[in-house]
Structure formats: C-alpha cells, structure tokens
Amino acid sequence: MATISPGGAYIGTPSPFLGKKLKPFSLTSPILSFKPTVKLNSSCRAQLIDTVHNLFIGVGVGLPCTVMECGDMIYRSTLPKSNGLTITAPGVALALTALSYLWATPGVAPGFFDMFVLAFVERLFRPTFRKDDFVVGKKLGEGSFGVVYKVSLSKKRSNEEGEYVLKKATEYGAVEIWMNERVRRACGNSCADFVYGFLDKSSKKGPEYWLLWKYEGESTLAGLMQSKEFPYNVETIILGKVQDLPKGLERENKIIQTIMRQLLFALDGLHSTGIIHRDVKPQNIIFSEGSRSFKIIDLGAAADLRVGINYIPKEFLLDPRYAAPEQYIMSTQTPSAPSAPVAAALSPVLWQMNLPDRFDIYSIGLIFLQMAFPSLRSDSNLIQFNRQLKRCDYDLTAWRKLVEPRASADLRRGFELVDLDGGIGWELLTSMVRYKARQRISAKAALAHPYFDRQGLLALSVMQNLRMQYFRATQQDYSEAANWVIQLMAKNGTEKDGGFTETQLQELREKEPRKKANAQRNALASALRLQRKLVKTVTETIDEISDGRKTVWWNRWIPREE
C-alpha cells in the first residue's frame, strides 16, 4: 500500500509508531464553529481529544525503538529505566545497616524522637511547681551536689498526693534536671521517680536549682549493708516473704542474686539511653518501697554521651573508693562534643571506640564484692582492698592467691559464697572487676550470665554453653602472648637474643655528621612554633565559645522561677 505525502511517497503499511495523519479542516468545520447555544456532543468531544493527543503526544519522531523505548537485553544500559522502586540485595543491606546504626547504643533515632517529640509533649502536660508550693520537713541528707529534704504540698492537688523529696542544688543542678528528665522518659524504672525541676533566681545567695521526686523511702543500700543481719534484712522487703531455706550460704546467695539483678537492670536502662552515672556506690542506691526494688539516684555527676552533656575532656567526677582505675569514661584524646545533631550522629561510633559504660560496671563489681565479703563493707577495709588490688595489677585471681592462705573467717565465707554452683559467681565478679575496660562485661551481657539462672550452669543448653565458652575466651587477657610475639618479631634488635641493638647498628653505619643549625633555620623553627601556638590558642577560644553555646541551648529546657 502506497501512501502519498507532501514530502514524498512511502510504500508499505503505515507505521504504528508514527502519528495519525491530520485531516485539514476549514474554519466552517463544525468542530471549530462554536455557538454559545449549541453544545458539543460526545462524538465531537472524542474527536477533539483525539486531535489534541495526535498533535502533542502521538506524533512519533525518530526510529521505532527510540519512540517505544525498547532496548537490548544483552546491553542492559539501553533498557528503559523503571519508574517503580526496585529492591536489590545491596540496597536492602544498606538500609539494614543504616537502621542498625540509627538504633545502636546510645540511639540516634530514639534520641531525636525523645528530644523533639516526647520532650515537647511532656512539657505541655506535666504539672508545674513553685518554691512556695512546698512545706519543708526534716532533712534527709546532704551530699556533694546539694541538700535533700522531705516535703509536702502546701495546697493539696487532686492528682498530686503523698510526700515528696526536694533537693536544693547549686552546682550541677542544671545537669541533674536534664538527666532526670531524660531518664523519666526513657527508663523511669531505673532511677527515682522524678516529678519536676526548675531554676530559682530570687535567692540572695545566687541562682538555685530545685528538684522534686516522689518519696519512695529512705533506706539506701549502704545503710542496709551496715546491718549485721545483711542480707537477711533485705529478704522480706525485696522478696515479700521468707525463703524456705535454712540460714546459710545458699539462702544468702539467692538474696544477693536478686539485688544484683535489679542493680544491673537499672544500670542497663541508663546505658541504653546513653547516660553514664560515674558515681555508682551504695549511698546512691535507694530501696523503693512501692516497687520493692533498688533504684539509682544522684545524677549530678552523670554524663549524657548521646549529645555530650556534662562531658568535658580530661575532667573526671568520681568517688575514689568505687571508681575504675582508668578514671575517665572516654579517651583523653576525645575532643569536646560538637553541636547536638552532630554529636548524636557520631555517638554510636564513639561509644564503640571507648565503651564508656564499663566504667559503671567496675563500681557494680565492687558493690557485689562488698555484699559477698562482710569485711569489705567498711570504708577503711575497702580502701585497703583497693591498695592490695592495685599491687596485684587489678587481678582478682592474683589477689585471691595473696590473701586466701591467711584469710579471716569472713573472707573464707565470702570465697565459699562466690564458689557456689561451680564458681559461677566468682566468674561474674572477675568479669566485672578488671583493669582494662574493654575486657569487662556489659550490663546487658551480665544479666544474661548463668549466675542469675536458678539452676546455674546445669540449665544451659548446647548453644548457651557454646556462647559461654566464647565469652570466656574473649574475656581472657592475651597481653603476655602479644608481648611474646612482639619480642620474637624484634629478635634482631635485642642483644639478649643474639642480635644488635639500635645503638650498635647506628655505630656500624657510616654517615655524615649532622649539619649545625644556621640562623635561617632557627628563624624558620621559631616561626613554626609561633604558628602552632596561635592555632592552639584560637582552637581553645573556639572551644570555649562552643561550650558556652552548648550550655545555653540545653539550659533553655529548664523552667525558671523569677
């Protein structure tokens, strides 16, 4: 079939890839003649739509494959791009990696949700208080971060009943308000039930921070341990009943297991949200009568490593009796925290590099040691123990070999208690009290330890036994083996192993004497030293300004009472 067109002739069937031929129409055509009183019927509408389609869309210009977007399966780059979402294995792996990073400790995604959603909603609905709303009662205690009182409300509220604990703090008060609000939203069962905190500037002594908690009891773990009846004096209040066991090591071990489980659970809640307490000790652990559990208090020294609140490099806040030997929760080379979004985004990397949560684990290990060994519950004996442990390079096994042959009755009884069930308690204790922070067990891993199982090692399955063996292997100290390998590799550089020392090799090497420094060289060195000093000064100034800005932004979250 021949088709004649103004540009020439084409023999064959019309190509479906080319547009339909447009029929010329005159001005008198019924399509273009329009009168307001005449309506277009359905056939005219269809013809008009078809004409527009052929004019703008249906006109094919180019080769058929270009118009139809067909391609070659061999050369896949010529295939048309898919408009839909294509799921690939690398894409799925990348998405899972990103999600795991965002939810890794201390939690980037939960942190943004907590700061910009939960905190905002909480400020809208939480009750507010003023200093005049309280009737101050007896003084409960006084610490390094403030004075604590037992108070009641001057005007009863319908939804606020009972007694409260009020703390007046001047130093680190803003930090403690921030930490308690974070803990209340993320892990309320780990610490005391925080209600409200505000800044009072009306005092003549200067700005004062007031913090309010619900009253849950006055008993601390330190006070309970000082009793000669410990741990039996805790049995009824923590378990609700007396065990059907005679007084002895097995019954005491059950009570201590329960206390340790609650302490590790509270500590795991803090660490999961990025908070390091840095001052864990029996005096900062209270017993909540309502929940019948131990809770951690006094967050004035805590550091929020999710956004860098209260973290200052080369500065430490601790109690030397319970502090880990490294004294710092992060490497001293770690710089000051940047802005909050950047700090939160980088927090999982810094957490895995430093493992700051192991600092608190060492303190919990010493508390475990005090509960098992009655003679270590006094401050003087604890200080003496720390000195002995330091002389033993913080190796509990070496300390045991040192003191066990001439141990007192209390020490021997403590060793018998931790040796129950195949020594599983001693194994947990040695995994907590270690010199190197990276070799210590985490709070989450400690909760899964067989020590907290009722049947101990006998209740482990095959997979649990394999995991336990892997854990024991990874907790071993391979420093001696590493030193032996390094010494073997450096064999040629030691005179002891038949090689030459570095000094001897330098003497055997022929070399020209060093040139004396001239005036030009000295001037250049002085200029470089001055440049480094200027750069260091500018950097420190910028850090101070940055610290000031950081203090301003998170202080704005604290309510004020003028």
UniProtKB/Swiss-Prot annotation:
Coiled coil: none
Single Gene Ontology MF annotation: protein kinase activity
Compartment(s) of residence: Plastid, Chloroplast thylakoid membrane
Protein name: Serine/threonine-protein kinase STN7, chloroplastic
Positions of transmembrane segments: none
GO BP term (any one): regulation of photosynthesis, light reaction
Transit peptide: 1-45
Task performed by this protein: Serine/threonine protein kinase required for state transition by phosphorylating light-harvesting complex II outer antennae (LCHII). State transition plays a central role in response to environmental changes and allows to adjust to changing light conditions via the redistribution of light excitation energy between photosystem II (PSII) and photosystem I (PSI). Phosphorylates the minor light harvesting protein LHCB4.2/CP29 and is involved in the light-dependent phosphorylation of TSP9. Acts as a key component of the long-term response (LTR) signaling pathway.
GO cellular component, one term: chloroplast
InterPro entries registered for this protein in UniProt: Kinase-like_dom_sf, Prot_kinase_dom, Protein_kinase_ATP_BS, Ser/Thr_kinase_AS
Major location (coarse): plastid
Family matches, as Pfam families: Pkinase (PF00069)
